[in-house]
Amino acid sequence: MARVGAPLGVLLLSGGHERAHYALVVAAGAAALGREVTLFATNAGCRLLLDPTPLLEDAREAALAERGVATITALLPAAAELGVRRIACEAGLRAEDLAGAALAPGVELAGVATFLAAVGDGQILTL
């Protein structure tokens, strides 16, 4: 699919299920519309990009599934298939004492400069 519109950067700071879930909703939605999307997780937000992510154990995950809402379980592979670039912040992993944790396949390890360069003059949404 040809990319259209300005790049979108999604900056995930929170380790909570609700914000991580919506970061994936926005990222996948924008990518489905043809936008170039970079999801950058830092600090507690890095937990979303771990393999496996502990967010799957959150009670909200089961509640969303029961209500027919796309879950993190469904959105993570969908975002990857749609071409969402996923980056875990190296400093954020260290700050959360996750430096040795396994990242999900396809997740890059980089810093904020890489994220900002990827987004360029595009939009940044912080969750």
Q: Residue spans of the language-model regions?
A:
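A glycine-rich helix N-cap at a beta->alpha junction
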Residues: 57-87
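Short internal beta-strands
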Residues: 37-43, 86-90
